């Protein structure tokens, strides 16, 4: 087996051409590494912690994250093993309301309105126990869906959304943890 960092670098980052994506930012790239700002407006970086690499430790650029979104939409050819792995991250497991929870992503059938997206990305839903319904697996990911994921740490906030059928995606990276509702609204517009 490999450690997580080596596995991510060799099987995901390098094959996708993510040249500015790291678990540990190299010394020569530290001047490009943005400072985040916490709620007290003090500069912060992502703190090391238990499972930090696995849970929240990837540092990237908007360009590399856009490449990752394109790969998830199947816009460019990939090694079959990697494409199957990316497709598997979009297999639906559970649903709650109009949101379907995949392995990584959340999905909403199109058309979808802003209040539905905001509700599905609200702290109330994310942080509290919520009854769900099990889903049957489909052979391949749906294409006429809004796929999204929020992410944040103390000083950073991110939001990714894409609609595979339209071959359209949005990547938002901020060096402040803005509320999910604001991130979703910006992407939706």
What is the role of each PLM region?
Residues 2-41, 77-81:
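Active-site helix/loop module of the DD-peptidase/beta-lactamase fold
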Residues 9-10, 14, 45-189:
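Catalytic loop of the DD-peptidase/beta-lactamase superfamily, centered on the K-T-G motif
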């Amino acid at each position: 087996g490999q450690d997580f960092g080596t596995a991510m670098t060799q099987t995901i980052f390098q094959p996708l051409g993510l040249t500015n994506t790291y678990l540990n930012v190299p010394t020569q790239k530290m001047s490009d590494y943005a400072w985040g700002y916490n709620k007290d407006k003090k500069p912060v970086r992502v703190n090391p912690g238990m499972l930090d690499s696995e849970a929240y430790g990837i540092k990237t650029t908007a360009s590399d994250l856009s490449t990752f979104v394109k790969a998830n939409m199947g816009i460019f050819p990939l090694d079959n093993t990697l494409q199957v792995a990316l497709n598997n991250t979009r297999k639906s497991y559970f649903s709650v309301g109009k949101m379907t929870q995949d392995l990584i992503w959340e999905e909403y059938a199109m058309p979808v309105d802003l209040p539905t997206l905001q509700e599905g990305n609200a702290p109330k839903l994310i942080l509290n126990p919520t009854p769900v319904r099990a889903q049957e697996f489909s052979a391949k990911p749906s294409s006429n869906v809004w796929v999204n994921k929020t992410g944040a740490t103390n000083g950073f906030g991110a939001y990714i959304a894409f609609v595979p059928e339209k071959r359209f995606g949005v990547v938002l990276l901020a060096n402040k943890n803005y509320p999910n509702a604001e991130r979703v609204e910006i992407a939706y517009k």
